[in-house]
């Protein structure tokens, strides 16, 4: 059994894994994981992935996946910890933090083509792949297909 700190660390690490699942084009079981419960589609995907692939307790899944819908929680600190970590990791300034959940433009229809960015992408673009010494340097080549689908298959095999 994990401690609460360990559970919150897991929730914080996995809270946006749904963005990966969306881009990998996995199917969402809408009847069980509704966008309306979580406020954003990627959060519903996160809940499904954490339930299906990580077999996490539903309370832990909620700490993580409800990070955009705090008004529907009981106000416990655990929800706020993950939500605050999400905002801090995104580098939000205070005024952006206050308007974050109100901005519905965040998930437009073209989300699948929007590359997930990391700190290394600021200057150059890196291949979307597993971390490996053979692909740690940036590439000039552009992908001709959805690299997230390939990466998802590798993820499942691990």
Label every model-predicted segment.
Residues 1-152:
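Divalent metal-dependent catalytic cores for phosphoryl transfer on phosphate-bearing substrates
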């Amino acid at each position: 059994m994990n401690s609460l700190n360990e559970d919150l660390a897991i929730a914080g690490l996995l809270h946006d894994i749904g963005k990966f699942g969306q881009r990998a084009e996995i199917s969402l079981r809408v009847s069980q994981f509704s966008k309306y419960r979580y406020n954003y589609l990627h959060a519903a995907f996160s809940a499904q992935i954490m339930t299906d692939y990580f077999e996490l307790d539903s309370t832990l899944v909620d700490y993580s996946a409800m990070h955009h819908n705090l008004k529907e929680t009981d106000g416990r600190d655990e929800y706020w910890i993950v939500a605050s970590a999400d905002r801090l990791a995104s580098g939000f300034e205070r005024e952006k933090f206050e308007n974050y959940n109100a901005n519905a433009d965040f998930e437009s229809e073209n989300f699948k083509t929007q590359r997930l960015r990391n700190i290394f992408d600021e200057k150059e673009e890196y291949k979307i792949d597993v971390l490996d010494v053979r692909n740690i340097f940036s590439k000039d080549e552009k992908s001709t297909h959805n690299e997230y689908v390939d990466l998802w298959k590798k993820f499942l095999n691990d």
